[in-house]
Amino acid sequence: MDSTDKNGESVSSVSSSRLQSRKPPNLSITIPPPEASAPGEQASMLPQRPRNPAYMKSVSLQEQRGRWQEGSSEKRPGFRRQASLSQSIRKGTAQWFGVSGDWEAKRQHWQRRSLHHCSVRYGRLKASCQRDLELPSQEVPSFQGTESPKPCKMPKIVDPLARGRAFRHPDEVDRPHAPHPPLTPGVLSLTSFTSVRSGHSHLPRRKRMSVAHMSFQAAAALLKGRSVLDATGQRCRVVKRSFAYPSFLEEDVVDGADTFDSSFFSKEEMSSMPDDVFESPPLSASYFRGIPRSASPVSPDGVQIPLKEYGRPPVAGTRRGKRIASKVKHFAFDRKKRHYGLGVVGNWLNRSYRRSISSTVQRQLESFDSHRPYFTYWLTFVHIIITLLVICTYGIAPVGFAQHVTTQLVLRNKGVYESVKYIQQENFWIGPSSIDLIHLGAKFSPCIRKDQQIEQLVLRERDLERDSGCCVQNDHSGCIQTQRKDCSETLATFVKWQDDTGPPMDKSDLGQKRTSGAVCHQDPRTCEEPASSGAHIWPDDITKWPICTEQAKSNRTGFLHMDCQIKGRPCCISTKGSCEITTREYCEFMHGYFHEEATLCSQVHCLDKVCGLLPFLNPEVPDQFYRLWLSLFLHAGVVHCLVSVVFQMTILRDLEKLAGWHRIAIIFILSGITGNLASAIFLPYRAEVGPAGSQFGLLACLFVELFQSWQLLERPWKAFLNLSAIVLFLFICGLLPWIDNIAHIFGFLSGLLLAFAFLPYITFGTSDKYRKRALILVSLLVFAGLFASLVIWLYVYPINWPWIEYLTCFPFTSRFCEKYELDQVLH
């Protein structure tokens, strides 16, 4: 018994001396004493069996069995009640908005992410913020203070000097070989000290190739006749391996005394700490195979490693050979990281890291993770595919800024060829015409809601058609429905029913006669489907007659307007919903829609045909509100699509790497819909396509990040002026045709509000969760009010301000802003 105590005392003295020698001079660890417990709690203070006793086993001591076998009949932990659906939704929503109870644990991670992004976009940070940025993530002090919270009864303590990997994870080879931070609150981590001394085992992380780069290499290999796997794996063949080389599993040579001290700390506590910043990447075993065994390897710091630590013969029984193939694993999980400080703008400006960067900062830059830009790649792919399909289907309109005039001899209503002109607006984006864009789903107010001016235009056309008649040529060459003034009195006969010459309303009643008509090739007396009889008598108004689908089977009817050959039928021309009875040749030349089945313009709905897409539920009431977000995926041409792709691969991808695809996708879509909604109100007769409002909403996210990081930047006014100059330049570009500045303005306003609500982590650290909740609530309420006001202006109280079109197209020349065939005031 005495010998045992002596041995224990000797071992503990040796252990304490070794720990004192390894302790840095300026390190002090204060362990609060446990509080006095009540007598009833003494039973709970007795040693209990741990969950995993194998992890608590000491290397040098034998485990006592009898004590744990006595407690084998203890009760298992009871089942915990599963949270309800409402609680799960409430907790998930709070975590998504960043106002949950564990926000303080995530605040530091997102604070560092915001600092990195601000340093890339807006310039150098302040000196204090730059020092916080260069510290490891566990050492960054909080803006709210670094004082320790009140200690609990039994705080968890992890030995900061136990650095041996084999003693932290004795049974696993692939666990991270970086020291875990202490769990004592208020004590900074010693990783900065241990990383300098054990820096020879941390090689710099290799840069991984992206999928696009590997695809280009594979295509080049196929052209050269080589194997695809050889081309894609040529770079990775030398240094790629998914686990560390066995000779570098231990960072230091630790003796039994260190083992004795470190065995008191459980494996569960040490493995539960997050080690995402200090975890080093695995070293490649194939990298060390290239080094001859006769020469001692040299670490990156210049320290020669002994051969006894390096060259260990592999054991056949413990060698791991059942891993996933290297090429498959790296193809599935590798991604090209966004290097902070060297973003897209940094590459354009030939920016690089300084050579005097410390190893700690370099490891942080290499290990910092970012989101995958899924939404950016998906959106870019959809934009490119849709643009190519549209151009292949509808062709390219004349390129330029003015109006293009086409002249051709076309057969007209009178049976002679006439010289007619077709005028259309040129498209400098190298894409289809405005009529085709409207048919594809462009933002166009007459297709979204009932327009008063277009409705009045249709009513005027129907009034003229109500007084029309059938003009029959005297030489029996044909007939056409027209006005009396357009029918020649010498060469043709104008058939128009009067009070005495009209047919009776009903075949059985000869009293009341018709006064509206006649109509070429349509008569209630000869039409069998739908028949005019009984309760279904056609009204005495030709603008309300249905389309006759079946005529009486007879060669001659005895009526002059029925026995002639009809020359003209309704044709929907331009984008105003106007209709004209004309020949097929003239209709095709004017890029209209010819209706072979109808005889009157009142029998067709031109606006439904011009708008395309899904037909209206009520042909008289347009209801294609889905154009507000469908137009976000369309472009006016190839150049327009290229501009969007460049913006998305720079600004959008950078923001998505910072905040994630779900937040950026919400801001992109909602700001684009809001911009198109405002454009549909103030510019109702302009066909606009493209994500203009969405792009300015993303620019507003940069302003929000700048405002939230104003106190962190060294020169915030310079960053603000740079962003303002970019927005002003884009606004000036919006004065050109086919670019919608109204969508830019309202997209920017909506993006500004949505960024405050859906980007909660890009904030300065002094705001608490209650203040953040108020900010989110106010931003969402203001956005909802703005969106509701725009909806009311569009559907309930439509407005039409012609002067506002100068904000979206300034007339630099007399014909620079011609009306695109879509006048603000219809005549």
Curated annotation (Swiss-Prot):
Disulfide cross-links: none
One Pfam family here: Rhomboid
Expression sites by tissue: Detected in retina and spleen.
Skewed-composition ranges (Basic and acidic residues): 64-77
Cytoplasmic compartment segments: 1-380, 653-663, 708-718, 766-773
Ranges facing Lumenal side: 402-631, 685-686, 740-744, 795-827
Membrane-spanning ranges: 381-401, 632-652, 664-684, 687-707, 719-739, 745-765, 774-794
Oligomer status and interactors: Interacts with EGF. Interacts (via cytoplasmic N-terminus) with FRMD8/iTAP; this interaction leads to mutual protein stabilization. Interacts with ADAM17/TACE.
Purpose: Regulates ADAM17 protease, a sheddase of the epidermal growth factor (EGF) receptor ligands and TNF, thereby plays a role in sleep, cell survival, proliferation, migration and inflammation. Does not exhibit any protease activity on its own.
Protein's name according to its UniProt entry: Inactive rhomboid protein 2
Organism (species): Canis lupus familiaris (Dog)
Gene: RHBDF2
